[in-house]
Amino acid sequence: MMIFAKNNNLNFAVVVKLLGMLLLIEAAFMLPSAIVSFAYHETAAMWSFIYSIAITVGAGALGFLLPVRNHDMGRREGFLLTSLTWVVFSFFGMLPFIFDPCGLPVPDAFFETMSGLTTTGASTMESVENQSHGILLWRSVTHFIGGMGIILFTLAVIPMLNKQSGLQLFNAEVTGLTHEKIRPRISNTAKTLWTIYIALNIILIILLWAGPMNLFEAICHGMSTIATGGFSTRDSSIADFNSNYIKIVMTIFMFIAGISFSLIYRVSKGDFKSLIKNDVARWYFFIAIGAAAAITAIEYVQSDEPLSQLVVDIPFQTISDITSSGFNATDINLWHHGSIMIAIALMMIGACAGSTTGGIKIDRLVLIVKNLKNEMYRILFPNAINPVRVNGKVLSNDMTAKVCAFRLLFALSLFVGSLALSLSGINLFDAIFTSMSCLSNNGLGYGFTGQNFADINPYGKWVLSFLMLVGRLEFSAVMILLTKAFWSK
């Protein structure tokens, strides 16, 4: 047991024990898919989940039963647990895809699971319509788990983490510039956020079921939408339903899912002024509206689609892009290059921090623009003191430095990912688009990946899986593990 001793002041034992708890939770999330497979008489698929549950429970029990003397967790343990959780969840979550009769190779299965958990929504399946109901549900469940965050769910259900260690985990996984506790206790904050998340899922599922979708498809698409994931039960995504009702309803809920859940909480309490006065929410609204209007104008001139259909499809696709949902209401391969460039910009920017979306986040964009404005002002008036304010709060120089570091890591990761894909034979533009799609957790395909990501070689799938992980955890929780300082005393 010496391997689990507190080596170099890093408490490995408590990390392993918590990983065991988390695997038991993951096994519980697999159970509905096994039940659905049984209900649809998909015996082979049902057994694939039973095998997966048994293996996951066994591994989880080993970790959970590990004796731990010291339950203290610091920042390093928080970062280590956060990163390991997403990787371990992906390794065990891929088991149903491997054991299924339509089994995927390991690189494809890991990619599919990482894509689901990070709510990227990119798929290696050539046809999802050939998959069992259990597998289709499991894909959407991975979105549901990852949308609000694996660690955040753990904070809501494991009382022992309602300490300083819980705050470390919260800060390691939650996205954005600052992390707001809307309740005094971190566990209550997690429970409140998950309550809002589940409520939005239920409302959307009911609305989709009231339309052309059956209950099963409504459940799958409801979870995928609020998580801004993008997995669908149809090969042609939402376009296959040919329903403006579905597109309009999902556009509204994708937009809502792109707003900070802390802000949604305040609005649910009747504080509508907080939404109106919020700088980030206003930028989000105007960027989305402006981009939708610009793309609609371009496609109206360049395509043969009637305006009546463009005003439904383009807002859907625009909100899908900026919220990193990755759903398709139209074939973007037919778009004008100007529209594609706007879509890439939206993918990179993302929506609001504290939501289920990917990308750089509008919060950082607001800070970058305001800081640039201040720098221009200082050139004219060197002695002027004009601090950067976002939502009425003065942001420190340290916060600005963190945003600059984030931009550098984002650009570096995009460059390395694009280079790696281009070396595997993909043309440069497709390599950049695909890397951007995975790094921003968008999942949208174009050109080589227009239909799916199946044709990318195994090496490329591992690269893209890593990009999805660092994009979801916003670099620091993963990159810090690669530094010598993290492992030293």
Which functions belong to the PLM regions below?
Residues 1-489:
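Membrane-proximal intracellular helices of multi-pass ion channels
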